[in-house]
């Protein structure tokens, strides 16, 4: 009996000691959960876009947000200095779910810790994520070192056995918050494992990452200079679509990007000719965002067909053949737009051939299902893209007037020879926008683009026509455009080209006498560039030639991109065909 009491007493003491030990060792975890439950983490306050604030990324990690946390956009978690600090979920403004994983009562996200302009310390300069083994970027980096007989490629090392320090950017001292090996024990040259498959490279804040974005979908394409993929199409358990993550670096030096391309942002709302001719590529009605489905045209029922991918390759091929100086995307870029569609991923996919070739481009609006709220967000994202000319439109629209200039022989001596107009398909607003610009006598190579056709695209009786003209239904859903059509003539615009009607890829001559208008004008269609089961994907090209003094146009088809069709004169000073 006495012996049993002693055993019970020792058991109680051992249990109390075990409870105390467990409490002490778990206190940091308990403190983290209590603080996330009871204390709201501060919001990330920005004046303008994150790219322009001077904030860099101090650290990156994957953390679990539990159901009892007060907020998952901003959480309390431990820094490398063992302080509870605020971490922010990447791409908080995105409507789609950007979680990496989920379980009972928790969801995991990629979080980042900001390094503010008034703070000292090192920043993350490169990132990689892989759930299975070493990320490909790290493996390639080590392979290149070994290939170049760099001894650093064969081993890992640090300044000491227990610590690795990075020098502070503002002084020559080492930053004491970089005790990587002591905390994690895993590092590879300049790369450090941060758990859950994340690898970080740290360096001076001047080289630090400026922004991290998430993209949802199977066919994400990253083509922007200054941006690099952290992970491509990471499969997520319990989710139908993978996630890709990209980040924006501060400098281009670390990128293997074509040095021949002009990566400088266009600072003036104008276009400068580089040679005697100027080509414009019109892309219309892409309808991107379709699901990946089985290909009914193949015998195997499990064969996969991506609706959008052949059309991206089609645009690539046309650009290789034509080398255009400007790309104009005339509307209806989404297929059945809804809030679950990651429009950023779709836009990057459609402009990837354009951006990768360093071609200036612009969008005209033509999304009937998109509400005003989404329109603002979509246009703001479009305006942020490199080489995009829509940034010069200060309103939430796609109205643009871009002078076409000859190269300056001396500073300030550029001569305007033409004008490119883009309209937003609202007839009244388009009229008011165009009316405020005086006609320049020197500007003769003038073209206009928008998504919807004008009423004058339906002439009566016999008329000149070049191309396919299959859709001839009523345009009563469009307000009367006669005054706008006359104004186009008064401004000496030689042609206007639209999209919208997939069955039409022609140019119709709008006869001034027949339609009781002030002049003749070619009214063109770009055709459908996206996938359409009934119609062949096409693009239209306009060429302004200052040596021949004419404007010509033709089309290329996805069926054979090496051939052109329906070559025609739009205007010629010699032939005076207008």
UniProtKB/Swiss-Prot annotation:
One of its GO terms (cellular component) is cytoplasm. GO terms for molecular function: phosphoprotein phosphatase activity. Residues 1-28 form the signal peptide. InterPro entries: Calcineurin-like_PHP_ApaH, Metallo-depent_PP-like. Keywords: Signal. PANTHER family: PHOSPHATASE DCR2-RELATED, PHOSPHATASE DCR2-RELATED-RELATED. May be involved in the activation of the plasma membrane proton-ATPase by glucose. This is Protein SIA1. It comes from Kluyveromyces lactis (strain ATCC 8585 / CBS 2359 / DSM 70799 / NBRC 1267 / NRRL Y-1140 / WM37) (Yeast).
